[in-house]
Every structure is written in C-alpha cells, then in structure tokens.
C-alpha cells in the first residue's frame, strides 16, 4: 500500500510538470507551489529564480508551474496542488477574476494563498506583494510629460498607449495612474489599445496599424518591456531613427534596458521584482503559522514598503523608479540581472 501511494504521488507530480524546484526534501519546512501565469517574458522567468532562492533561504522548497497564459490550466493546477497539501501557494494570476474559485478552494482547505505581482481584490487572500502599479502609471505620466515638454515646449502631442491583457489588474492599474495624471493636460491625445495575452506580436501589430492612421504619434507607452521590442522593430522598419518616436515602458526588464542603451527607448519605470519576491519570504513563516501581520513600513532591500490591511487581506506595496540613460547600469534594477546578495530577514 505504501508503494502504491508513493507511486500515485509521483505520477501527480509528473503531471504537474514543475518548472523548477530546489530538490525533493531539500528543505525542512515543507513545499510551496508558485503558479506562474506564463514564461513568455523575463519578468516571469526571473521571478521563478528569485522566489525559489528566497524561500530556500528561509527553509522552504519551491515548485513552479507554468499556466501558459491559460486560465483553465491554472485552475486545474490549483486542484492538483491542493491535493498535495503544500505549506502555501504563491499565485501570479492569468486572469484576476477567473482564478477566484481556485483561491477559495485552497483557503477552504487550509492552504494560505500569497498573491505575487498581479493583484486580486475580489476575494480574501493571505498576503499580497505588489508593486505600486498605480504609482508606476503616475511616474510614467510624469516622465512622458517631461519628454513632450522637451519636444514641443509645452505638454502636448499624441501618445499611443499599449496595454497588456485587460484581464490583468497590473496593466489596468498602470492605465488608471497614467490617465489620471494626464488629465491635467488636455492638449495630449491618448490612443489606447490592448495587446491581448501580453503577446509581443499583438503590440507590434497595434503600433504598425496606428502609425499608418496616426503618423504624427510622438510617443508610444507600452506596459511591459517585452512589448517594446517589436514596437522598436516596427519603428526601424518604417525608417524611423531612435528618438523620432519616443518610447516608454513600465517593468524594467533587460530588453527594455537594452533599448534605452540603444536609444530607442527613453524611460523604463521599474517594477521592483526583487523586492516583491523577497517580501514573500520575509513574511512566509508568519503566514504559514497564521499569525497576524502588523501594518506599517517595512524595509525590503532598501525600499520602504507599506503593509496595509485591506478588505482582501494584508497588502504590501513596494515603490518603483524611473530608469533612463543616466542610471540604466545601476545594479539595483532587476533588468541588469544581478539578484540581491542581502540575506532574507524573516519578519519576527
């Protein structure tokens, strides 16, 4: 009977197709599953690495599962993982509404759910570690205002805003912050389109079509650096030189930093990936022990993060920063792929 049980567990694990683990039984506090929405961009792949290492430092093994941008697959992963009774589930949702039943099932089974990056506010969770996404949009707006001012002598012109997938709260919050800050400048016309599923080819097609119908676009604002790559390619194919049509992005990935160095992109507003990941490990022991988290300011890799108690649960918001040609090589930006060497300090 013991042999059959072990075999069934092994089959279940194989069916889950883990992307990365620190090694079976390598840690003494148990296993955590990280449900990744996709591995199509460097933010997601680097998040797997840093989350795995951060949890390892505090005694947990991590297994990461790729949902391949499919809500049905992510919900199936929830069902499979719940049966394995892990210490916790870390979730970066494909779609913030569709995944709610999975969250509720896990918590009903006594498994804490920690939300990483893609905020969910419609159902209770045990912890949320996010960038200040509305603030990212606000910072982008301030940077864009400066770029338009430098070009025209006043804040005016035409901006193409390319969202990610509209099912992702990350992009909707950036849009909210950006457009709220731009309302004070009625001479700026903003054209908004969404790159469904965060597909880079969709962003390229949007840019190509809009440059045909609106050849006087001054600036293109994309909500992730991997979307900026095809946009820069379209600009080059149309005979544009770096800076002819300005480009701003908002997550700080390596490809975005490279575009800054090459002159195609003027600003990246960084999403603080490393701090968001480390924060999960800082709080995990208290979450697993079902201890109350004290609201307040916490130092996360030198950033002042604010923990508040929201209707959906404890919410840690971490600030981003603008990256330009002047500071693009700063190692604190995750896009330079230099993970933090500072040991994780669990919250007591």
Write out the residue ranges for each language-model feature.
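Flexible loop/hinge segments that line or gate small-molecule binding clefts
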Residues: 97-135, 146, 150-158, 253-261, ...
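Hydrophobic alpha-helical segments within soluble ligand-binding/sensing domains
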Residues: 74, 129-156, 173, 202-204, ...
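Extracytoplasmic "Venus flytrap"
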Residues: 31-58, 62-80, 84, 92-96, ...
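Short beta-strand elements in bilobed, periplasmic/extracellular small-molecule ligand-binding domains
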Residues: 56-67, 158-161, 179-197
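Hinge/cleft segment of the Venus flytrap/periplasmic-binding protein
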Residues: 28-30, 162-166, 181-182, 283-348
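Hydrophobic alpha-helical
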Residues: 90-108, 178, 196-259
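Short, solvent-exposed amphipathic alpha-helices that sit
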Residues: 43-58, 136-143, 169-188, 206, ...
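Structural motif
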Residues: 62-85, 192-213, 228-230
């Amino acid at each position: 009977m013991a042999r059959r049980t072990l075999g069934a567990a092994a089959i279940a694990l194989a069916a889950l197709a883990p992307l990365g683990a620190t090694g079976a039984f390598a840690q003494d506090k148990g296993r955590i599953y990280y449900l990744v929405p996709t591995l199509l961009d460097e933010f997601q792949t680097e998040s797997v690495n840093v989350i795995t290492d951060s949890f390892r430092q505090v005694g947990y093994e991590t297994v990461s599962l790729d949902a391949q941008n499919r809500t049905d697959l992510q919900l199936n992963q929830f069902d499979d993982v719940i049966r394995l009774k892990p210490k916790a589930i870390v979730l970066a949702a494909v779609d913030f509404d569709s995944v709610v039943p999975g969250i509720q099932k896990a918590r009903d089974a006594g498994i804490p759910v920690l939300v990483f990056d893609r905020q969910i506010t419609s159902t209770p969770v045990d912890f949320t570690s996010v960038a200040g996404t509305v603030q990212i949009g606000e910072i982008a707006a301030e940077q864009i205002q400066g770029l338009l001012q430098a070009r025209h002598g006043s804040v005016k012109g035409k901006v193409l805003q390319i969202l990610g997938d509209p099912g992702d709260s990350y992009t909707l919050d950036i849009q909210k912050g950006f457009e709220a800050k731009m309302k004070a400048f009625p001479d700026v016309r903003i054209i908004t389109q969404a790159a469904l599923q965060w597909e880079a080819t969709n962003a390229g097609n949007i840019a190509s079509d809009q440059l045909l119908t609106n050849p006087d676009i001054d600036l293109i604002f994309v909500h992730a650096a991997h979307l900026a790559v095809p946009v820069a390619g379209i600009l080059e194919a149309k005979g544009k030189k770096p800076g002819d049509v300005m480009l701003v992005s908002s997550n700080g990935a390596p490809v975005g930093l490279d575009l800054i160095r090459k002159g195609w992109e003027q600003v990246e507003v960084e999403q603080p990936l490393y701090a968001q990941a480390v924060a999960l490990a800082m709080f995990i022991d208290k979450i697993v022990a079902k201890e109350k988290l004290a609201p307040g300011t916490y130092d996360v890799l030198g950033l002042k993060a604010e923990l508040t108690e929201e209707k959906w649960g404890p919410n840690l918001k971490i600030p981003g920063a603008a990256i330009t040609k002047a500071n693009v090589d700063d190692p604190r930006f995750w896009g330079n792929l230099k993970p933090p060497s500072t040991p994780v300090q669990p919250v007591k």
